[in-house]
């Protein structure tokens, strides 16, 4: 938790960016994984609640009165029976003091606060809920059915929160760098131990263990697989085979809940084949191009599209694509190989603020999301600003089901050499991902050390440990 003045200043700035009414920011509750009171999923506080209050205990709600410039922390103290099982914890008033608030109230009083605002014609602002218990809580407090809450959420509050959270301060960048340091250890450990005969699940479990031992936990479900063509393939009992590529997409969350997110693809046996190098070098070139051009004022959408053009040109050199590059990209033919966006924002969420709505977080009045397959998965397209933290993550994938589907429909046959693509159906996929900070005149890697990604560096690093 940062110094309480940080949270006081953030809440004051939030009030200034709002017109009037009452802001209600819901913290998260514990969530049982199989039955109540035993066996909970790991607790994770809501990120916007964390940003403005910094408190990691479950069952809390923050109330900010815009008009009267007052603040209150709502929550119930635990009783002696809970203390027996879980130990002593800070009281609600103690936690309020830690975040610079003096007024507290039990949860039963929250409805009266909301009713008073409503009865005096003042708007109750809340963010879009994403957990069922918060949706039920909002229904009980405001009478809004869960199916209508996304539309009823305060757009004014959404935009105000995004405007504050999207540009990271120096103290936030320092925390992200700490998460990146853990991420470096996770990925280099995966490279060090990967070899034929191990299972994906074994290596993935070791990667997760590194996150838990050095930080809070992993920032999302770790992807470790030799089937890199599956975008979000969880580790399974597949046995790693010599000649295949292992894809590791993993990140850490540090004790302040800031995230890292990296992807590396490397040969199971430590040596790339020529065929693998040809595809890998294209992804590497796309990754490095984005690093060269990312800077304040540049549309991230344009960077993404130029990466698609570069990838198409190089796939044409291998004979996998053909025809006019611009026509192929405009038609979306490249998306058979790259069906996702170039990158996303990152911070307290690995996909930062995604619950607030893609149209507000990654896009704006200037540019809105595409509806075209592949490009519609781009999570951010707006102009970069100094202080943005982005991921740079191009990839090339050979997805058998997608290849068969498009070929059966005759899609983009003027741009895709299906006969040659057929010979790559057992190739898998390659993705390279790094976390970058948009600086005053460009961008830089986050973290003190860069996880090896140039082919010779990858092979040399793995050779030291095989």
Predicted regions and their residues:
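Active-site neighborhoods and metal-handling regions in enzymes and metal-associated proteins
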Residues: 1-466
């Amino acid at each position: 938790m940062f110094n309480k003045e940080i949270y006081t200043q953030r809440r004051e700035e939030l009030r200034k960016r709002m017109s009037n009414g009452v802001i209600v920011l819901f913290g998260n509750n514990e969530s049982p994984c199989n039955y109540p009171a035993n066996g909970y999923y790991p607790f994770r506080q809501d990120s916007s609640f964390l940003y403005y209050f910094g408190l990691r205990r479950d069952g809390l709600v923050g109330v900010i009165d815009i008009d009267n410039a007052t603040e209150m922390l709502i929550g119930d103290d635990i009783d002696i029976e809970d203390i027996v099982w879980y130990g002593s914890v800070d009281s609600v008033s103690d936690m309020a003091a830690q975040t610079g608030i003096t007024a507290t109230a039990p949860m039963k009083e929250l409805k009266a606060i909301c009713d008073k605002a409503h009865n005096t014609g003042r708007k109750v602002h809340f963010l879009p809920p994403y957990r069922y218990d918060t949706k039920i809580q909002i229904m009980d407090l405001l009478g809004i059915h869960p199916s209508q809450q996304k539309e009823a959420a305060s757009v004014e509050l959404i935009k105000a929160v995004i405007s504050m959270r999207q540009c990271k301060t120096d103290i936030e960048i320092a925390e992200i760098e700490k998460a990146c340091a853990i991420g470096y250890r996770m990925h280099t450990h995966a490279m060090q131990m990967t070899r034929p005969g191990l299972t994906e699940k074994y290596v993935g479990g070791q990667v997760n263990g590194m996150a838990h031992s050095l930080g809070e936990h992993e920032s999302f479900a770790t992807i470790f697989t030799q089937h890199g063509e599956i975008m979000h393939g969880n580790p399974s009992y597949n046995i790693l085979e010599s000649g295949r590529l292992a894809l590791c997409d993993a990140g850490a969350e540090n004790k302040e809940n800031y995230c890292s997110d990296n992807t590396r693809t490397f040969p199971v046996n430590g040596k790339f084949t020529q065929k693998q190098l040809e595809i890998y070098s294209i992804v590497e070139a796309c990754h490095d191009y984005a690093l060269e051009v990312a800077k304040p004022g540049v549309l991230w959408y344009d960077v993404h599209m130029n990466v698609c053009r570069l990838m198409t040109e190089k796939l044409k050199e291998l004979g996998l694509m053909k025809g006019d590059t611009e026509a192929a990209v405009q038609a979306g033919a490249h998306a058979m190989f790259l069906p996702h966006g170039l990158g996303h924002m990152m911070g307290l969420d690995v996909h930062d603020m995604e619950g607030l709505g893609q149209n507000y977080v990654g896009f704006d009045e200037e540019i809105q999301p595409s509806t075209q397959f592949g490009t519609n998965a781009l999570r951010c397209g707006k102009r970069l600003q100094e202080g943005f933290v982005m991921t740079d993550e191009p990839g090339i994938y050979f997805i058998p089901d997608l290849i068969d589907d498009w070929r059966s429909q005759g899609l983009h046959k003027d741009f895709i050499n299906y006969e040659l693509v057929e010979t790559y159906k057992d190739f898998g996929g390659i993705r390279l991902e790094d976390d970058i900070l948009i600086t005053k005149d460009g961008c830089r890697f986050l973290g003190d050390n860069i996880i090896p990604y140039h082919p010779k560096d990858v092979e040399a690093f793995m050779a030291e440990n095989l």
